[in-house]
């Protein structure tokens, strides 16, 4: 009984809060990777209101570019027309994913929104040394960085000087029965 009450309260709070969050990330409706699976599970099990704009996906470079451009334009429209959106939660990785996400970080900050950058990239340390000043400047524009483990949190604390850093482990399987959100 207590679990049901807690789930009900969490669902109410989450419905109210989740309507203020705009998520940016890869195509996730038919997940083919870790980030897509996390986003799919967020929509299905965690957030009652899942405002999401897809910024990557496609089978060739032209399709990928068009997806990024259309995602950027859609985000600008949402931020212009929906004053309820307070937080932009951007899922990213390394290399091209991070470069693409940097544009979305800049746009969100231009509209005065809080930015949560959720970094999934296992190769981020290798990527960081390719352009540390620019990458650090993007990271430091964010209000919060979400990492997947304590070791990643410690790493990001050494290369940033501003954003809060939090750990949120990936959810890759549906929650157990009984306290489903």
What is each of the regions a protein language model found here?
Residues 2-58, 112:
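N-terminal subdomain of nucleotide-sugar transferases
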Residues 22-24, 178-181:
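Conserved donor-binding/catalytic core segment of Leloir-type glycosyltransferases
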Residues 66-79:
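Glycine-rich, highly charged phosphate/nucleotide-binding loops
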Residues 71, 87-111:
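An aromatic- and histidine-rich active-site surface loop
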Residues 81, 137-138:
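Structural alpha-helical scaffold elements that stabilize or flank donor/cofactor-binding regions
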Residues 92-97, 113-130, 144:
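A short, histidine- and acid-enriched strand-loop-helix "catalytic/donor-clamping" loop
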Residues 111-114, 163:
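A short helix->loop->beta-strand "cap" motif at the edges of active sites that frequently abuts
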Residues 140-178:
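Donor nucleotide-sugar binding/catalytic pocket of nucleotide-sugar-dependent glycosyltransferases
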